[in-house]
């Protein structure tokens, strides 16, 4: 769902503002970033370091309490998803509700109905933990080879062992957690327009 939000809004508006309201000093902000780098999500870091204090579901509700009105319908993206006529799924380290809220504003939620797995479904083991993607592939019978195109905005997530044989695509963005030099070898393609990328795939299939 991060990828979908980036199609229509600045990354900082996604989750940064709610977290900043609680991170009232620099130390808290530094801890937040440290946990993200070390544990793949801030929530995962909190759960590992303060298992008796953190309410994971309340945390998800809080950080996803954002203004979705900044998102707009993406008619082109919807059209290409429909015309491509392939199975599509969403794997998110956030909540399913957040992903659905984003998709509703963009106008593609019906195309992913029943095809979303979130951090709760992953037993709070965030991507790139291979257990998460393996769980999703097993549930939806997704091929773990070049038949599957795996698109991510966080290039680290493409390094998952579960995706090693998939076609891996990075949606270009300036998220500070992206270390492109470190993960460049796991990226097969880079894109900055999802609808255009899907259109190119469709045209290749039609040849």
What residue ranges belong to the model's regions?
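Asp-based phosphoryl-transfer active-site loop
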Residues: 1-2
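Conserved short-loop catalytic and cofactor-binding motifs
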Residues: 30-34, 65-68, 87, 120-124
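Charged, low-complexity surface patches
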Residues: 35-36, 73, 92, 150
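Short, solvent-exposed polar/charged micro-motifs at secondary-structure junctions
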Residues: 37-41, 70, 199-203
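Asp-based, Mg2+/Mn2+-dependent phosphohydrolase catalytic module
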Residues: 82, 89, 95-96, 100-207
């Amino acid at each position: 769902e991060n990828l979908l939000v980036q199609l229509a809004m600045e990354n900082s508006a996604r989750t940064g503002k709610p977290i900043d309201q609680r991170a009232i000093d620099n130390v808290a902000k530094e801890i937040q970033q440290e946990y993200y780098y070390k544990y793949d999500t801030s929530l995962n870091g909190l759960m590992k370091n303060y298992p008796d204090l953190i309410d994971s579901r309340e945390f998800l509700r809080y950080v996803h309490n954002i203004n979705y009105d900044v998102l707009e319908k993406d008619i082109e993206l919807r059209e290409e998803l429909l015309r491509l006529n392939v199975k599509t799924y969403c794997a998110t380290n956030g909540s399913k509700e957040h992903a659905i809220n984003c998709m509703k504003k963009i106008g593609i939620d019906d195309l992913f109905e029943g095809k979303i797995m979130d951090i709760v479904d992953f037993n709070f083991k965030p991507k790139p933990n291979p257990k998460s993607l393996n769980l999703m592939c097993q549930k939806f019978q997704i091929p773990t080879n070049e038949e599957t195109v795996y698109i991510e905005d966080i290039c680290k997530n493409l390094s998952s062992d579960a995706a090693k044989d998939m076609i891996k695509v990075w949606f270009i963005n300036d998220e500070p957690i992206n270390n492109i030099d470190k993960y460049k070898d796991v990226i097969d393609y880079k894109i900055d327009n999802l609808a255009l990328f899907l259109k190119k795939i469709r045209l290749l299939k039609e040849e």
